[in-house]
From Swiss-Prot:
Pfam families tied to this protein: Hydrolase_3 (PF08282)
Binding-site residues for phosphate, renumbered to this chain: 10, 43-44, 183, 209
Protein name, entry field: Putative phosphatase YkrA
Organism in which the protein naturally occurs: Bacillus subtilis (strain 168)
UniProt key word Amino-acid biosynthesis: no
Phylogenetic classification of the source organism: Bacteria, Bacillati, Bacillota, Bacilli, Bacillales
One Gene Ontology term of the molecular function aspect: magnesium ion binding
Length: 257
């Protein structure tokens, strides 16, 4: 079988609802790589939050920050930071709305305020500690994503920023990306680098930030626990993550000999 490019989201896809990796997923990912397929993590997370999962699964390629930072075989092949002036203007709006922000750089993150309950809950869901506080951290640095902590109905106040796209990942937080940025854009950069046809690309996901990725690749797989919008556009809907959904889909799609 010719090798394929296979992209996996993390939460609700690689990770089950207890933030553990099912044994069937471990074995499937290892076998995909053993048989010559290129396996990627494709996540909204930062490189430093993706790293433990990469090490655990022996994966050396990833798309992070929803497509803004791409690595193939341990080499950075694409970076797309947010414009500093636009960050400054958004921070003014966030300050007026009393909405905390977390700056996400390549190797660290900083918060605009300390000990905010919404940040504590959102960041805690990523199994990481509350970031240090530095409201000017973005100045002179490459910031690839912001975490804006606001309720869904409060998000409308940020529609006037054409430089950004907002993608909700938590009931209390939304990712702030460069306009047009997505996991699909990250995959395009991989395909530009490697001689692969779009028909040889597969992606697995469960959330709203996977929509463009699932729609773009040759075969998009929605987990059984995915949001309805993703299931509607997927080429294949597998079993939930808690029911060995990745292993089931890989078998049904004939990706292993």
């Amino acid at each position: 079988m010719d090798s394929k490019l296979i992209f996996f989201d993390i939460d609700g896809t690689i990770y089950d609802h207890d933030k553990n990796i099912p044994e069937s997923t471990r074995k499937t990912v290892a076998e995909l790589q053993r048989q010559g397929h290129h396996v990627f993590i494709a996540s909204g997370r930062s490189p430093f939050l993706v790293k433990p999962i990469l090490e655990e699964l022996g994966i050396h390629s990833f798309i992070s920050y929803n497509g803004q930072f791409v690595v193939f075989e341990n080499q950075v092949i694409y970076k797309n930071p947010l414009p500093e002036n636009a960050i400054r203007r958004l921070l003014k709006q966030a300050d007026e709305g009393k909405h905390p922000v977390v700056f996400m750089a390549e190797d660290t993150m900083k918060a605009t305020v300390a000990d905010h309950p919404h940040v504590l809950e959102g960041i805690g869901s990523l199994k990481t500690d509350y970031p240090e506080t530095d409201d000017l951290f973005y100045e002179g640095k490459e910031i690839f994503q912001l975490l804006l902590f606001c309720q869904d109905e409060e998000e409308k106040a940020y529609a006037a920023f054409p430089e950004f796209d907002l993608v909700r990942w938590h009931e209390l937080s939304t990712d702030v990306l460069p306009h047009g940025g997505s996991k699909a854009e990250g995959i395009k950069k991989v395909i530009e680098r490697l001689p692969f046809d779009i028909g040889d690309t597969y992606a697995f996901g469960d959330g709203l930030n996977d929509l463009q990725m699932i729609e773009y690749v040759g075969t998009g797989v929605a987990m059984g626990n995915a949001v309805p919008e993703l299931k509607e556009i997927a080429d294949f809907v597998t079993k939930p993550v808690d029911e060995d959904g990745i292993a089931y889909a890989v078998k049904e799609l004939g990706l292993l000999k």
